[in-house]
Amino acid sequence: MDYNVKDFGALGDGVSDDTAAIQAAIDAAYAAGGGTVYLPAGEYRVSGGEEPSDGCLTIKSNVHIVGAGMGETVIKLVDGWDQDVTGIVRSAYGEETSNFGMSDLTLDGNRDNTSGKVDGWFNGYIPGEDGADRDVTLERVEIREMSGYGFDPHEQTINLTIRDSVAHDNGLDGFVADFQIGGVFENNVSYNNDRHGFNIVTSTNDFVLSNNVAYGNGGAGLVVQRGSSDVAHPYDILIDGGAYYDNGLEGVQIKMAHDVTLQNAEIYGNGLYGVRVYGAEDVQILDNYIHDNSQNGSYAEILLQSYDDTAGVSGNFYTTTGTWIEGNTIVGSANSTYGIQERDDGTDYSSLYANSVSNVQNGSVRLYGANSVVSDLPGTGQQATLEGTAGNDTLGGSDAHETLLGLDGNDRLNGGAGNDILDGGAGRDNLTGGAGADLFRVSARTDSYRTDSASFNDLITDFDASQDRIDLSALGFTGLGDGYNGTLLLQVSADGSRTYLKSLEADAEGRRFEIALDGNFAGLLGAGNLLFERTAIEGDAGDNALLGTSAAETLLGHAGNDTLDGGAGDDILVGGAGRDSLTGGAGADVFRFDALSDSQRNYDIGDNQGDRIADFAVGEDKLDVSALGFTGLGDGYNGTLALVLNSAGDRTYVKSYENGADGYRFEFSLDGNYLELLGNEDFIFATPSGQQLLEGSAGNDSLQGTAADEVIHGGGGRDTLAGGAGADVFRFSELTDSYRDSASYADLITDFDASEDRIDLSGLGFSGLGNGYGGTLALQVNSAGTRTYLKSFETNAAGERFEIALDGDLSALGGANLILDARTVLAGGDGNDTLSGSSAAEELLGGVGNDSLDGGAGNDILDGGAGRDTLSGGSGSDIFRFGGALDSFRNYASGTNGTDSITDFTPGEDLIDLSVLGYTGLGDGYNGTLAIVLNDAGTKTYLKNRESDAEGNQFEIALEGNHADQLDASDFIFATAAATTGIEVVGGSGTQTDQLA
């Protein structure tokens, strides 16, 4: 319903005070549940209330004030007003107001004929209190001649829109967005204001500024900033399009804010910087035209600097980090120093890609950050890296441009929207780019391959040939062909549902590179979407000095004592023969050795041809020795490499102690002390040969193993699996490999041997045995005792729940039979084995025999098995697991001692896993408990079951050192009381005697 203010006595004659009449129309509309208050063309004079917060006119919920057009309908403050007015039109102070606004009129503050601070439009709730104004719309409104702010939506407001409006000749800012949530400024103009054109301030978030213009303002054209109070910084701000020019300070300033994007704007003719990023994080500056700024002195067109607020309200120092600047055209004025400049104040991690910079005085770019990079090539705008683990990970991206790194394990990567980079790493990975132009990167041939009997290839589920790309440049293939001589064969399945890129040439382990794409891409893949080569910079047989650029390149020194510097970019450096000096420069670089003679030393004759790496970056760079056959770090023997620090502590050597026939052995050095920093993850090693794989299909398969140790993976369908002799692993990589819903699709394992076989569930996220809920699996045996089930009672969205069937009564099945994470397994045989772990998390299985197990660094699991074993966890949080009562026992009657010894147990960090044996706690050694006993010398602590089995054997473990007063239940993984119901404690007589009575 419309309420014409003239019906309430307003005159609009430019003389009379119409405040009361207009307010009466507003109140009437509000009382009726809402409506439109209409002001015909004319000049309506208004005056303020007793307090500044009274304003002149108070707008209310569901009321919209509408005029006849900007300049036609004018609401103007009366001459001579000398008090502050916080809003000529405003919402009520301390009330939550919703669904209101104003359109098609002008507010005039009459600045020349009044005194006091006067604002034009004001709304918002009480600062710091719960509550907010909501759903506010202003369209085609002009605000002029205010001594204070023009548009000032102030404090908590949700869903504000101001569009097609103008603010000019105001004493402070033209447009303010103060603590606005989910709002929009669109197609507005702000000019000739004494301070800023647009000021986005005080915790504003999820806010869009689209196609706005600010010019001729005394301050900046647009500012995004925290403001003067110590509050949460503005974030998730998008500035898209528009123009910011001829302002006194910056064109755009982003200060104490994060996750701000400035794109597609023209910024020019401003007094200081075109754009200034000031104590902000994760700012993107994309595809703008920034030119002819620095009109008032010598400044950069774009400046990145940190902000020192240590003497301010927060007491903090805000470092500018994570700025991404790409695709901008930057042209300097006669005063412009740099196109893009970092200050030397901690500003770092800036990424500059494909910007065109010209006509600047000192240089295109000046960077100080150690981790900042610049490239002439386009980037993909990555603002975050999502990194997996050595296990089977699921990584999901957002709408941003991200890099997803699966690392080891069978990973599932989904980029979401945005231009993403997906690198599955080792393992059989499932890669989905999502929306956007995505890059699928393969970093090693062994990341995706097949053998004669099984497939370990990655699958790309949604490749878009029109915009996605596959980066194979690190693999050495030359292009498409017949699959031989370094080419890849493009092959489509018979039903046209899948396309393969494959090499038909196998490595020494029988592995052939192969990657699969869902869909038929015959005729669609080529130079536009397959990246085979990076630029090669090659030397010759002499002593060469090779220098890379900002692009990703391969530097090949060949023979001679060469000096290689990759510059910026993710480079590959291959020194070749001779004593070479290698510097990767910025970027994630790979230092590759293709032959043992590339870097070698002969200690007998004193000939040192070892290469030297000047700037290895742990966690970013890689050392590629995969072609040489080394399989890990160790003692320098048996295919391992040792780390050795020189006496000065300033150089680390990576060396093999095994000489060739000519007396030379492989060795290179790194400048600096990396002794405690380098791990297997910093190397690309050769993959050791291991168990054979039997791989099923999506159908109902019957897989029969042999006497060898095998990994058996049925895949989809209802499969029958038999391992045969040997220590076999039955692998389930998807919930739907074995499940039931209204019917059973569970796989059946016909010959599971609990003494040596295992079930690999590492890709499914289960934590262990339990009641079938909360990520656990229930262990159930049918009433006839002929079949055992491992089952989850939790269903997926399709109503499917995981279940496996095993022939026989396997009620003694325990954690030792399940692989719940994807750690590397080091397994011994039937003899007396010595197993040594690395810095990674590993599982060491001694098997039969008197074994010596050393976990090394990492959080390891040590299981000595049968025999009298010596167990050393090394550093990390280790688990010493016992899967049978005779794994560690003593027979006092016969004098037989099969007690395992743990050399370095750390209470509070390490754990002893006895959950399979039925023990429920510490005690007197009876009734399912273990007694703690210290020897007379105080040098060894025993854990003892005092109840013998039928042969007189008693379970017992020895721990080096005095732990008698340190051990408690938290150092053990015991069986729960529920789990032991109806189960006899392993190794006990079955007769319970109350020793405490």
UniProtKB/Swiss-Prot annotation:
Inhibited by zinc. It is found in: Secreted. Its EC number is 5.1.3.37. It is an enzyme of class 5 (isomerase). GO terms for cellular component: extracellular space. Pathway: Glycan biosynthesis; alginate biosynthesis. PbH1 repeats lie at residues 133-155, 157-179, 180-202, 204-226, 257-279, 280-315, 320-359. Keywords: Alginate biosynthesis, Calcium, Isomerase, Repeat, Secreted. GO terms for molecular function: calcium ion binding; isomerase activity. InterPro entries: Beta_helix, Carb-bd_sugar_hydrolysis-dom, Hemolysin-typ_Ca-bd_CS, Hemolysn_Ca-bd, PbH1, Pectin_lyas_fold, Pectin_lyase_fold/virulence, Peptidase_M10B_C. GO terms for biological process: alginic acid biosynthetic process. Hemolysin-type calcium-binding repeats lie at residues 388-403, 406-422, 424-439, 557-573, 574-591, 696-711, 713-730, 828-839, 846-862, 864-880. Its main location: secreted. It catalyses: [(1->4)-beta-D-mannuronosyl](n) = [alginate](n). It comes from the Bacteria. Pfam families: Beta_helix, HemolysinCabind, Pect-lyase_RHGA_epim, Peptidase_M10_C. Its cofactor is Ca(2+). Belongs to the D-mannuronate C5-epimerase family. Composed of one catalytically active A module and four R modules. Each enzyme of this family of C5 epimerases introduces its own characteristic sequence distribution of G-blocks in their substrates, explaining the extensive sequence variability of alginates. These alginates of varying composition have different physical properties and are necessary at different stages of the bacterium life cycle. Converts beta-D-mannuronic acid (M) to alpha-L-guluronic acid (G), producing a polymer with gel-forming capacity, required for the formation of the cyst coat. This is Mannuronan C5-epimerase AlgE2.
